[in-house]
């Protein structure tokens, strides 16, 4: 993705300024494989048997637009977004985040339990919901304040071929939960009992 190239260019420039050889920079770039281990929260893709989860730290309009550009080419029967607002940003920024989400996703789950940054959970949820409704007043939207419960709900209700795009600002917890579900599936365990 273009924005990944934009992210690596400053690292290459810094390495060059610090006197690193071109061969060492080349070796570093060739052995760098984006993954949940090396880049937690940056386009971490988890392919389950019947659906896919993409975990990313997109948390502002620019990040969300870059994520949209990346996911627009991904095939899915339905795209479900799990989003949260940002308390130290303007109302307009949170509205825009909601509006971009309404463009990106067939269904949206708003969660808002951590890192409120000066606003209340209800204020942030309303800002996102207002932004969603500005773009599409009929967009299917579910409010589940707990990130853990929102992820669990999305995975439990995933239909075949769906893509769940999880925009998280608490990467370790979200990553642990998704990896736990993936591990359960790979062991043949039911993720959820009916």
Model-derived features: positions:
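ATP-dependent carboxylate-amine ligase
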Residues: 1, 10-194
């Amino acid at each position: 993705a273009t924005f990944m190239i934009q992210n690596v260019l400053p690292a290459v420039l810094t390495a060059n300024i610090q006197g690193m050889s071109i061969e060492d920079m080349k070796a570093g770039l060739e052995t760098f494989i984006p993954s949940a281990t090396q880049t937690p929260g940056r386009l971490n893709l988890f392919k389950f048997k019947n659906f896919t989860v993409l975990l990313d730290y997109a948390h502002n309009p620019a990040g969300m637009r870059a994520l949209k550009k990346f996911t627009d080419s991904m095939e899915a029967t339905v795209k479900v977004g799990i989003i949260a607002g940002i308390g130290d940003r303007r109302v307009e920024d949170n509205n825009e985040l909601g509006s971009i989400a309404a463009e990106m996703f067939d269904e949206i789950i708003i969660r808002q339990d951590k890192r409120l940054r000066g606003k209340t959970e209800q204020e942030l949820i309303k800002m996102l919901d207002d932004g969603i409704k500005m773009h599409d007043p009929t967009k299917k939207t579910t409010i589940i304040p707990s990130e853990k419960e929102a992820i669990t709900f999305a995975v439990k209700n995933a239909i075949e071929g769906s893509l769940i795009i999880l925009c998280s600002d608490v990467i370790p917890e979200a990553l642990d939960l998704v990896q736990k579900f993936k591990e359960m599936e790979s062991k043949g365990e039911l993720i959820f009992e009916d």
